[in-house]
């Protein structure tokens, strides 16, 4: 639904207490809030304040609101595309890009490489910048394997998690792999700096939350946008479908868990499920 700028609607008419996000694999995430906080798709709130002067900086409130929208969209986009199965970290060497601290210059170089990988290697990706303590910029995201080449770095992540470690011997390496350790790869196609890649393991939801949190970090650190965007994405990516309607908070299904949206002080119950396509039975997930 496209926004009708000729006949705007009152906020009360387009705000609802429930939102269902339906993913291509049939999974549904139902969210029920204690008040109407979900806006119908295609509508945006009209600014009640005086319009921002040309060239003026956006307010902290508008930046936070934009970051929340971007984080939610990033999360949903990643959920809708299970082929995004590798978590990667990339850096750009100063000798290649000229300035490790210049977001625009890095974004331009990275985007060019990503575009080539989409065309030549059928890459699909979602990538977010992160500002490190020293001011340098790293890039984190999820990518499809596509035609990329992964080279074993020799380091592992222990079965219980933690930072990558280098086994002291081939025997220890083999023992850790047998115990369920996870290989850390380097991206052989990436020649502009450092890279790591780890195939996702464990709960996918935790990995997606980990990726989307970088938008919050970027907004808090004042890192800014890449050409007006909070994150980069490309390749063949499926989109979820969003529906809004009204349900009472206590109508949430059994098994829903409560979540506090701290930015707006709203309570929300979340329920994830898969409707069985043949029987119609609801399968929790």
Regions picked out by a protein language model, each given a short descriptive name:
Residues 1-135, 145-285:
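Right-hand nucleic-acid polymerase module
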Residues 140-143:
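Short beta-strand->loop micro-motif that forms the acidic, two-metal-ion catalytic signature
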């Amino acid at each position: 639904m496209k926004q009708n700028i000729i006949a705007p609607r009152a906020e009360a008419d387009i705000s609802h207490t429930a939102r269902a996000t339906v993913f291509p694999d049939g999974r549904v995430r139902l969210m029920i809030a204690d008040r109407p906080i979900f806006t119908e798709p295609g509508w945006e709130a009209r600014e009640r304040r005086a319009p921002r002067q040309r060239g003026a900086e956006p307010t902290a409130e508008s930046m936070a609101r934009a970051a929340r929208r971007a984080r939610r969209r990033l999360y949903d986009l990643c959920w809708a595309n299970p082929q995004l199965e590798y978590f990667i970290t990339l850096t750009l060497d100063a000798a290649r890009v000229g300035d490790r601290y210049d977001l625009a210059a890095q974004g331009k170089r990275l985007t060019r490489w990503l575009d080539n990988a989409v065309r030549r290697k059928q890459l699909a990706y979602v990538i977010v910048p992160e500002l490190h303590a020293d001011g340098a910029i790293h890039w984190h995201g999820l990518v499809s394997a596509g035609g990329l080449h992964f080279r074993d770095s020799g380091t592992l992540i222990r079965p219980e998690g933690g930072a990558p470690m280098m086994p002291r011997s081939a025997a220890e390496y083999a023992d850790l792999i047998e115990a369920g350790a996870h290989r850390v790869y380097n991206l052989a196609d990436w020649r502009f700096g450092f890279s790591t890649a780890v195939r996702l393991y464990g709960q996918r939801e935790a990995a997606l939350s980990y990726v989307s949190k970088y938008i919050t970090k970027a907004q808090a650190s004042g890192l800014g946008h890449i050409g007006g965007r909070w994150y980069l994405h490309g390749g063949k990516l499926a989109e979820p479908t969003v529906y809004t309607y009204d349900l009472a908070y206590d109508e949430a299904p059994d098994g829903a868990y409560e979540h506090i949206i701290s930015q707006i002080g709203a309570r929300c119950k979340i329920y994830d499920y898969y409707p069985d396509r043949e029987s119609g039975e609801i399968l929790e997930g």
